[in-house]
Amino acid sequence: SGLDTSKNDYAWTDLTYLLHKANVSWAYYLSEGNQPDCADDAMLCQAKSQSQKVPGIWNPLPAFDTVKQDNQLANIQTVDKYFTAAKNGTLPAVSWITPDNPVSEHPPAKISTGQAYVTSLINAVMQGPDWDSTAIFLSWDDWGGFYDHVVPPKVDEIGYGLRVPGLVISPYA
């Protein structure tokens, strides 16, 4: 289930490659441990070991050719390093953080647990020395859910499409 590592890796250009080529620092923060890694649309599945170097549903980057070829695997770090970097003012120019299952807001996880986790991530930056020059782009990977309980209005045969929430948080927003 999950990412099939027996097939060829991803050979297309990704954002990390473009950042690397432009000499823009980046990091991808994740939680280690055992996480559900469901194939397709399965609701339940066995947990798989997740780590910085192991591709999986929460960490696709080790499967990208450019991440390996450009020696960027070290940019994939555990989330505890995010909190340390935020406190010390040493976050890279671009950071991504992916949750683990208990804080992902995916069923059966509690939404309040996910919201508390996101709040801790944001507060870490706000309380750090880089807050004055930081913008946080918060988005979710799914549409629907509890935040959007009404179908978008029908304007034509195509429609607006499904809505995915996004927030920009900064001293200037």
Where are these regions (language model features)?
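N-terminal pro-sequences and low-complexity stem/linker regions of secreted or lumenal proteins
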Residues: S1-A173
